[in-house]
């Protein structure tokens, strides 16, 4: 298993500067008992790549438990009550932010930012915007509407400051409304209160529509078409956006590689929006060659280089991504094999690999 780390060059166009790092410490997560790695994190999970993404994603937000399961148990090491992840984000302007997340098997979550306890995972996500591109991400166009709603919500969350309060109030109104429906008919007083709150949330959503349109259409060749409205039967929690080509859905008329490429471009478009908002976004790209051919892989490398962001990419075939970058792009290569992480020289055949990390606490 190989991993590429694309360093972040200086924005002014001069020679590459030292990229912002995200050093991390891991305590009793699955496959790793205790580890401290600077710049790049990896550990074995079958092939050895996914535990790295578990831990780095946790530094951004506890948005998932496992890439293969929605349960929490696959993340926590066997016979351990909890797992803990620490991260340190170093920004280009010299600011340092310390992040910490701990969660036990009962589901209790503790988040600390700069030594202070925080209650909302949104504060953690705001501290480190992170985009994940993996085989599941390629189903953005053909998956359930919930996937596309989450995609748009992520972009607006990092661009529009008004989004989170409006979204929270809308979710509260929907929970109250659903609770009333489960207990029978809604009395006129409760119905009027709920309608008034939903109308306010509709007003907020109209103000945020411009942000959603930028997330869905900017930097793309074809726009999305909203197929939902605020009436019955489609309500805001049932909203969806689909893309049409010659009045036909792409999932029925386009090749799989084309659909995957459109999904990737949507992710890249969100990176541009975050960048315009003066934020830093990190990309985690898992098993890229499995979904994109050589032409599209090279195109993705160019798009990532234009973003000037920090990127972590894994692949099984070293040659599949070795030639994708420009010669002036700083790239670090890591090889993972049986809990041993080595850093071979770019362009070498792997005979003189220098070990960079070998922890006896990692369990194969």
Curated annotation (Swiss-Prot):
Keywords: ATP-binding, Cytoplasm, DNA damage, DNA repair, DNA replication, DNA-binding, Nucleotide-binding, SOS response. Coiled coil: none annotated. GO terms for biological process: DNA replication; DNA synthesis involved in DNA repair; double-strand break repair; SOS response. It comes from the Bacteria. ATP binds at residues 43-50. It is found in: Cytoplasm. InterPro entries: DNA-binding_RecF, DNA-binding_RecF_CS, P-loop_NTPase, RecF/RecN/SMC_N, RecF_2. One of its GO terms (cellular component) is cytoplasm. One of its GO terms (molecular function) is ATP binding. SUPFAM superfamilies: P-loop containing nucleoside triphosphate hydrolases. Residues 345-364 are annotated as: Disordered. The RecF protein is involved in DNA metabolism; it is required for DNA replication and normal SOS inducibility. RecF binds preferentially to single-stranded, linear DNA. It also seems to bind ATP. Belongs to the RecF family. PANTHER family: DNA REPLICATION AND REPAIR PROTEIN RECF. This is DNA replication and repair protein RecF.
């Amino acid at each position: 298993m190989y991993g590429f780390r694309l360093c972040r060059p200086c924005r002014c166009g001069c020679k590459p500067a030292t990229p912002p790092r995200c050093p991390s410490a891991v305590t009793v997560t699955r496959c790793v008992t205790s580890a401290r790695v600077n710049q790049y994190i990896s550990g074995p999970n079958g092939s050895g790549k996914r535990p790295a993404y578990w831990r780095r994603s946790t530094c951004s937000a506890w948005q998932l438990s496992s890439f293969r399961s929605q349960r929490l148990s696959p993340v926590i090491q066997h016979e351990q009550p909890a797992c803990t992840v620490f991260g340190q984000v170093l920004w280009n302007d010299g600011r340092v932010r310390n992040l910490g997340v701990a969660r036990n098997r009962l589901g209790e979550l503790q988040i600390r930012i700069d030594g202070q306890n925080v209650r909302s995972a949104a504060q953690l996500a705001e501290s480190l915007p992170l985009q994940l591109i993996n085989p599941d991400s390629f189903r953005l166009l053909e998956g359930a509407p919930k996937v596309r709603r989450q995609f748009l919500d992520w972009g607006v969350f990092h661009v529009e400051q008004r989004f989170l309060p409006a979204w929270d109030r809308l979710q509260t109104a929907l929970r109250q409304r659903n609770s009333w429906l489960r207990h029978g008919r809604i009395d006129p007083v409760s119905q009027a209160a709920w309608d008034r709150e939903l109308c306010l949330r509709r007003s907020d959503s109209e103000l945020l529509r411009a942000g959603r349109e930028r997330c869905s259409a900017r930097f793309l060749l074809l726009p999305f078409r909203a197929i939902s409205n605020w009436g019955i039967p489609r309500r805001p929690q049932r909203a969806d956006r689909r893309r049409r080509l010659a009045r036909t859905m792409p999932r029925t008329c386009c090749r799989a590689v084309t659909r995957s490429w459109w999904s990737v471009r949507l992710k890249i478009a969100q990176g541009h929006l975050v960048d315009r908002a003066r934020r830093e976004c990190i990309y985690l790209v898992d098993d890229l060659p499995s979904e994109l051919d050589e032409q599209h892989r090279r195109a993705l490398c160019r798009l990532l280089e234009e973003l000037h962001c920090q990127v972590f990419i894994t692949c099984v075939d070293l040659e599949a991504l070795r030639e994708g970058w420009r010669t002036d792009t700083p790239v670090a290569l890591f090889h993972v094999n049986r809990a041993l992480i080595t850093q071979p020289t770019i362009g070498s055949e792997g005979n003189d690999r220098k070990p960079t990390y070998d922890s006896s606490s990692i369990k194969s």
